[in-house]
Amino acid sequence: AYFDAASARAEGAVQLHEGKPGNLERAVEQTFGDVDGGFAAADLVREHAFHYAEVNHAMMEPNAAVAHWDAERGRLTLHSVTQVPYYVHLALARCLQLDESAIRVVKPFVGGGFGHRTETLNFEVIAGLLARAAGGTVRLELSREETFLTHRGRPETDVRMKIGLTKTGAITAIEAEVVQRGGAYAGYGLVTILY
């Protein structure tokens, strides 16, 4: 088992998944403008590395869902605290093996999410499965402990940044490498690297 990104990416590390050499879930490279020229024009160039621990979100309202199965029409309606109702909709269709038109996801006002709810969460799918099995309505609410145990949180992140500045404080160039530890089964949280 690897407990940090550096170990998982080290030479000779066991490849965890077929088609993912170097144990990289995804690599994104972006270049804008003349970075080398920007550093050459800088009066000051600073380079530093930062480490950010994994974060578990603590929203005020709990993770909860109400699922209703309409047996007569073969339709599911799910009310959930999600930030991404369309992703939940697609995941429910796939997991319940239903046509997408047979599923409706309702997202009420979400008081807090902080990125925690930017992927389909297990309790949403479980609520849908239970409602169908019961042939009616199921309400599922996770305790704080259950939420911490079943969610990946925001991944541990290492950032190496180099920045060029003029004497007036204008930024002339930035070079950054950001690595997030997503684990063997990365979730949507890895997309936060792009924000």
Residues of each region from the PLM?
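Structural alpha/beta core scaffold segments of enzyme domains
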Residues: 1-195
